[in-house]
């Protein structure tokens, strides 16, 4: 391959062939979707001008934001563990951290982290880090998003919004029956967001009477699916792109959407067994309190 022309060769022998069309030999080329590790695939040694995407019948130039997002996504270590310069323990909402630590101890009663001070706890969790080469330290992207104060989050991630809309039982003159968004009444970090929306999402779900031995089981497969969908929306979001973590509760179902494209092809997701978290540290923070699993 001429690396001066194209950045990566993703074609295999099976992607090229020929066929007979009305007596004429036609060469066909199937261009597969590139693995996230190789994106963006670009030409002429210029990713900003040489990256294209196929939208149905045409190829389009990728925007600068799309190119940057692909470079960030190429890392296997995720995008939420980087040190945020200038963001310190002063930017942590202590009430959020206290609530999380109580829940953490409930799920991990014998864990040694329960007895360490807040900064060390956050460092072990991946929410706080120290650059060993420069000795600079501070919150990671995961730490600020999960436990940060509203103002600090807006200063660094003003490109991201969180929005919950309940569109059930609406009247002709209303667009929603309940809404949770930025209004200054709550610290809009990810922990507060998920803890506020989950009860709202499952409040109307039926809980058939079930027993596990002599203990009533209130959790159902639907409850678990809704929780998993909400957590997946958060841990797979691209917080470096502009967009909304949006949750809609409708009469006939739920809608979860987030900024960013899929790291894996849709076919691979449906096949199962393929799992790449965009924000593994945030994922682990939820897993440690019983929300979501590492697959």
Annotated model-derived regions:
Residues 1-46, 55:
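Divalent-cation
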Residues 2-9, 235-238, 287:
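Short, solvent-exposed secondary-structure boundary motifs
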Residues 15-17, 154, 244-246:
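Short, surface-exposed charged micro-motifs
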Residues 23-25, 243, 252:
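Beta-strand-connecting loop/turn residues
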Residues 27-29, 247, 256:
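Short beta-strand motif preference
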Residues 34, 50-241, 249-277, 290-295:
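Active-site helix-to-loop segments that bind/position phosphate- or nucleotide-bearing substrates
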Residues 278-285:
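Active-site "cap" helix and flanking loop/linker of ATP-utilizing ligase/carboxylase catalytic domains
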């Amino acid at each position: 391959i001429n690396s001066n022309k194209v950045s990566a060769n993703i074609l295999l022998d099976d992607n090229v062939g020929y066929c007979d069309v009305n007596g004429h030999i036609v060469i066909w080329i199937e261009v597969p979707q590139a693995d996230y590790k190789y994106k963006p695939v670009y030409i002429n040694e210029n990713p900003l001008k040489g990256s294209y995407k196929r939208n149905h019948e045409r190829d389009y130039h990728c925007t600068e934001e799309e190119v940057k997002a692909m470079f960030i996504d190429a890392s296997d270590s995720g995008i939420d563990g980087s040190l945020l310069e200038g963001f310190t323990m002063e930017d942590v909402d202590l009430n959020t951290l206290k609530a999380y630590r109580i829940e953490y101890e409930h799920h991990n009663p014998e864990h040694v982290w329960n007895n360490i001070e807040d900064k060390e706890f956050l460092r072990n969790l991946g929410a706080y880090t120290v650059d060993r080469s420069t000795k600079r330290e501070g919150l990671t992207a995961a730490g600020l998003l999960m436990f940060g104060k509203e103002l600090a989050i807006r200063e660094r991630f003003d490109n991201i919004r969180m929005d919950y809309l309940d569109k059930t039982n609406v009247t002709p003159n209303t667009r929603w029956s309940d809404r949770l968004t930025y209004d200054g009444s709550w610290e809009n970090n990810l922990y507060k967001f998920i803890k506020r929306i989950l009860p709202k999402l499952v409040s109307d779900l039926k809980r058939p009477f079930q027993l596990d031995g002599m203990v009533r089981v209130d959790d159902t497969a639907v409850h678990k699916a809704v929780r998993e969908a909400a957590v997946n929306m958060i841990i797979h979001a691209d917080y470096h792109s502009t967009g909304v973590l949006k949750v809609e509760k409708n009469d006939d179902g739920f809608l979860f959407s987030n900024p960013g494209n899929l790291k894996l092809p849709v076919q691979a997701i449906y096949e199962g067994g393929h799992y790449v978290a965009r924000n593994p540290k945030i994922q682990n923070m939820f897993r440690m309190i019983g929300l979501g699993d590492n697959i």
